[in-house]
């Protein structure tokens, strides 16, 4: 997401501020960008998540979650459109419409972070000079030059005191304050810093936005513009991007030009660290654009919920009847367990790996449906697996469950090895039009079960960032087995 949002080749230069007051035309354009990234208007998850035509002229609001939309689709989160009008016992009334929500166990008041209590230590006269207004939660004070200071309180500075701060901007704010306080002579001369301060209208802009009904979600300014404007004031030049090996992107014919704080080193001593960080950015971008890296994570995230499953079994031996299975496959998210993982040296189970947020996840997969043979005989069938994703190795794996407890993993079935589209029958990246199988990301695996070998082939077709349909096929050969299975999963 950051690669798309902060690709400097996506915008004309010099950059202008895209935040603040949002005209209807700008709102429609940004809504279009969001819809393109998501692959639709979100109605596939719920009618309550759909962005209606009349809402496209309103300023967009963005929230990022791996699981929310599919929790809604699966019914684990139930939505109601409106605002809570009253709460009586365990029943809430929603306005407009008067709909009732029953059996409420707890209420989370999601009013947002209120920064005003953080300013309680300041004297009242200072708060007045800062135009402090507790009722304006997003803009509680009005500061000069991108939220750094107020000229009437010259010995007070702010770093990161704005809605949704980014490290790069906070670093620039700290650099600015160091220059502003250590070289006061520049503040009234003809230097770049002096010119920027003379042209600055940040205080009045903040006051104007406080009651603006078209104020953006992040009113102070967008990240690339703030970095550019503060760097110009400090006389910092952006370093050239490292693009060796990066392909030109199809929408503009240019390589990825990713903005990172490392592109604004402020001394020769920082040059080596800057080079290492920029090379790291290039390496990640190269892997993401030219290899299957991160596809396993995208697949894992998008499996959540219930899928329709149609599967054909074709057997060459009478011991395994040919037939068709029709049913569902449910991926139930839970914290990752240690069952089946490699044991520690002292014999105790190894702790499950954790992702960057301190949690690791897995799915309990439950398949249920009816199998009908060619002869017309039918019976109910079910099976279970545990699906896991290893963040450190970027590997998706499937595990058998214990016979005595089918909620727990037993031992490894296979690890999924992804290829590039076009390999093993894949024909495309499974983007906006990628619905047909064989047009997505191919993957393969293998498993030897005593004398029987399972050759596994996957195909994952995405629509933008969401998995739209996928298939898995098994070719099983052994002394007493010779059959193929092909199953297709759709929402």
Short names for language-model regions:
Residues 102-114:
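Short hydrophobic core segments
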Residues 152-294:
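C-terminal, flexible cofactor-proximal segment of oxidoreductases
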Residues 1-46, 53-58, 62, 77-79, ...:
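Rossmann-like dinucleotide-binding core of oxidoreductases
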Residues 1-2, 120-160, 191:
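Glycine-rich loop(s) and the adjacent beta-strand/alpha-helix scaffold that form part
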Residues 2-67, 115, 236-285:
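Flavin (FAD/FMN)-binding glycine-rich loop and adjacent Rossmann-like elements that form
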Residues 76-93:
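A conserved short coil-to-beta-strand element within the FAD-binding core of flavoproteins
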Residues 288-491:
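Soluble ligand-binding/transfer domains with enclosed cavities or grooves
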